[in-house]
């Protein structure tokens, strides 16, 4: 399940709507803190319609309490869902954000938002190592202006990371070795050619005998 799918599912929830009104600490501890690990992120924050952080939970990777701007929340109110990247003191963070609605409005087009739900994960060395394993590539997190020349021994693909205003804040540089070993293919080709020549020789030999 993707993080986008998760945040879509969790943000049409009557209990969450009620929490934005009551700001009940016990509810937050039971249903958000208690289930935090299942979200597979480093940060969850819930904001009210006043654009003020109600509460948060985070791993030790993210110590910054509030990195979401009022300007962004006003934009989120209109668009309902967003994914973007932002630079904070700890590094580059991938953010998933959605408005909060009751359970009878899964498409979020019948009711006004009750608040905002924010999930984030740090693009950390462990995150990159996992991505390297999945993609079989060497990956670097580099600044927005970084560039690297292609060479004949590898394929380099930059992935731009955009903020919510569509500005590049960083890049993930995927590099994969392009070492094609033609020796095996060459051996197979030689065998095929030899077999073909032998076939012709045998054919000519027997055709002469029967003439």
Model-based region annotation:
Residues 130-132, 171-195:
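Membrane-interface helix-start motif
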Residues 17-29, 136-146, 175:
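Short, positively charged
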Residues 2-9, 34-53, 82-85, 114-123, ...:
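Short N-terminal helix-loop-first-beta-strand/juxtamembrane motif that initiates sensory/input modules
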Residues 195-211:
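Cytosolic-side ends of inner-membrane transmembrane helices, especially those
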């Amino acid at each position: 399940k993707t993080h986008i799918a998760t945040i879509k599912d969790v943000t049409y929830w009557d209990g969450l709507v009620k929490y934005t009104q009551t700001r009940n600490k016990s509810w937050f501890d039971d249903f958000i803190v208690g289930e935090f690990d299942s979200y597979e992120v480093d940060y969850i924050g819930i904001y009210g319609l006043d654009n003020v952080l109600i509460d948060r939970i985070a791993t030790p990777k993210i110590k910054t309490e509030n990195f979401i701007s009022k300007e962004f929340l006003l934009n989120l109110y209109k668009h309902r869902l967003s994914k973007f990247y932002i630079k904070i003191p700890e590094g580059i963070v991938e953010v998933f954000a959605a408005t909060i609605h009751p359970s009878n409005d899964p498409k979020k087009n019948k009711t006004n938002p009750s608040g905002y739900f924010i999930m984030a994960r740090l693009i950390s060395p462990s995150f990159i190592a996992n991505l390297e394993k999945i993609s079989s590539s060497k990956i670097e997190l580099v600044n927005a202006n970084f560039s690297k020349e292609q060479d004949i021994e590898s394929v380099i693909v930059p992935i731009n990371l955009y903020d919510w205003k569509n500005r590049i804040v960083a890049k993930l540089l995927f590099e994969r070795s392009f070492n094609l070993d033609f020796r095996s293919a060459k051996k197979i080709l030689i065998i095929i050619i030899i077999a073909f020549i032998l076939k012709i020789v045998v054919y000519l030999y027997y055709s002469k005998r029967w003439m």
